[in-house]
Amino acid sequence: MGQLSHINDEGTVRMVDTSDKPVTTRLAVASARVLMSPETVAAVQQHRTPKGDPLEAARLAGIMAAKRTAELIPLCHPLPLTHVDVQATIQDYGVYLESAVSTNAQTGVEMEALTAVSVAALTIYDMCKALDKGIVISELRLERKTGGKSGDFLRTPE
């Protein structure tokens, strides 16, 4: 395992200096699952949720969150995002969320992709909690990333 880049020689946290890194195209894809009762899944499918369409609200919230990641996560660089897409798909267990975030920058967008699906999942919870207090947000993870010094990453199927 390599050295942590956010820790300086004195052992305190710091924002990584990316000044000397080249600008490259970066992409990150993250996902999460929102587990809910079959009755709640049916309500989402049939547009019978009290606060409106949770899938559309989640997509918008995820896009907005990706753009504000540097304000939420300490030491993240503010990045000029070139694209953010959040998809919400109804499954038999609940909702599968996936975000894709890209930029041309000196550092990656993994945190932006993870933040997008995290906030999208929280939004679905908020929009459906009146119907189901037992909703679970699970399997938040990076699926793949491209670009940058550390190379590409692709999660292997389980």
Located regions from the model:
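C-terminal binding/interaction regions
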Residues: 1-55, 60-77, 81-158
